[in-house]
Regions:
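Surface-exposed loop and turn segments in beta-propeller and other repeat-based domains
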Residues: 97-103
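Predominantly extracellular/luminal regions of secreted and cell-surface proteins
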Residues: 1-28
């Protein structure tokens, strides 16, 4: 399995197997406590994937859990940066996604971004989250969870 560095720390309730949760090939189901989701509370997910050798890459995706009743919202943006040395990164893609709307049913959503093919050893993936729950939520202004799986 390729090494994954968590540049932001997941919430203690949703750490499970750490960064390997994002690349172990096991997708999360609707039970977000199953150990197949990694969760961030009020902060963006920022991880670096080491491919061990330079490889061509042209897309990245993450699956996010949507469960507004439990204050679990998807990513609002996905940024991808690449590097040959793991220190100097350059952005190759950035995509925004809509904030989850009131009444959205519980589901898993695939957020992806495609870009011109690049060769890189390291890939930094940043999943941006809504900083606070929207006005329509029962806890407006509070922090929210963003749960991700591969």
């Amino acid at each position: 399995m390729r090494p994954v560095t968590l540049n932001t720390i997941p919430h203690k309730s949703y750490t499970f197997k750490g960064g390997s949760t994002l690349i172990d090939g096991l997708y999360g189901d609707m039970n977000y406590r199953s150990g197949r989701w990694i969760g961030f509370y009020g902060t963006d997910m920022n991880v670096t994937l080491d491919l061990l050798e330079p490889k061509e890459v042209s897309s990245v995706f993450v699956n996010t859990m949507l469960n507004t009743g439990d204050a679990i919202f998807g990513a609002t943006g996905l940024k991808v940066e690449v590097s040959e040395d793991g220190k100097n990164f350059r952005r190759v893609a950035s995509e925004n996604f809509p904030v989850v709307e009131k009444g959205t049913k519980m589901q898993s959503r695939k957020d992806s971004v495609s870009f011109d093919k690049v060769k890189a050893r390291y890939i930094k993936i940043i999943a941006e989250v809504t900083p606070k729950l929207p006005a329509w939520h029962s806890m407006p202004g509070e922090k929210l969870f963003c749960l991700l799986t591969k």
